[in-house]
């Protein structure tokens, strides 16, 4: 799977996520997405996952819905996605993620 993403690059990942955003808003209540971590910095390895920050609307997803969203994104992008909900960020690491994140 990693090879597909390497050929696409970050621009292609952003395009895929941007194209999916309207459906994600309707189906899961996604307000915004952003990528951060090793893929964004160009430091990913063969088994690296893609870190995606998600902000959801006021409705709460069940654990199964959250996992379904994570799996859907993994399938669409072609690499394992690690989905992080913005409202659950701890102060110290949250600051670092928010400084690094590339909004979609």
Please give the residue ranges for each predicted region.
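Catalytic DNA-binding helix-loop module of base-excision-repair DNA glycosylases/AP lyases
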Residues: 38
């Amino acid at each position: 799977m990693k090879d597909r993403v390497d050929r696409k690059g970050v621009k292609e990942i952003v395009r895929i996520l941007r194209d999916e955003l309207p459906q994600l808003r309707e189906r899961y209540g996604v307000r915004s997405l952003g990528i951060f971590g090793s893929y964004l910095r160009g430091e990913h390895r063969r088994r690296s996952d893609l870190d995606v920050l998600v902000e959801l609307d006021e409705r709460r997803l069940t654990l199964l819905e959250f996992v379904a969203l994570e799996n859907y994104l993994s399938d669409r992008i072609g690499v394992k996605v690690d989905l992080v909900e913005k409202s659950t960020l701890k102060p110290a690491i949250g600051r670092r993620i928010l400084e690094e994140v590339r909004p979609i």
